[in-house]
Swiss-Prot record:
This is Cell division topological specificity factor. HAMAP family: MinE (MF_00262). It comes from Symbiobacterium thermophilum (strain DSM 24528 / JCM 14929 / IAM 14863 / T). Keywords: Cell cycle, Cell division. The lineage of its organism: Bacteria, Bacillati, Bacillota, Clostridia, Eubacteriales. The keyword Coiled coil does not apply. Pfam families: MinE (PF03776). The keyword Iron does not apply. Coiled coil: none annotated. Prevents the cell division inhibition by proteins MinC and MinD at internal division sites while permitting inhibition at polar sites. This ensures cell division at the proper site by restricting the formation of a division septum at the midpoint of the long axis of the cell. Belongs to the MinE family.
């Protein structure tokens, strides 16, 4: 996720930020038996799909898998700047 954001926006992230994100992905993997690469791919695909309909702030995006008893929930916090005009009221 950080690699994608860095490539798109050209922002540098500190080593601490990168290490923190990697640790978070490892912890999610341990709790849900989902690989960090799977979660990263999921985030990238969510960005791709949601960006068709809305302008979002990728750097503020947070996608996690949370476990409670025997269930896993996908929790996404995605800051939306605005809806794209072509998507408003369009039907597929």
């Amino acid at each position: 996720m950080l690699d994608l954001i860095s490539r798109v926006f050209g922002r540098d992230h500190s080593s601490a930020d990168i290490a923190r994100e990697r640790l978070r992905l490892v912890l999610v993997h341990d709790r849900t038996n989902v690989s960090p690469q799977f979660l990263e791919t999921l985030k990238e695909e969510l960005i791709e799909v949601i960006s068709r309909y809305m302008e979002i702030e990728e750097e503020g995006m947070d996608v996690t898998l949370q476990t409670a008893e025997n269930q896993v929930a996908l929790v996404a916090n995605i800051p939306v700047r605005r809806m794209k005009r072509a998507a408003v009221g369009s039907k597929r």
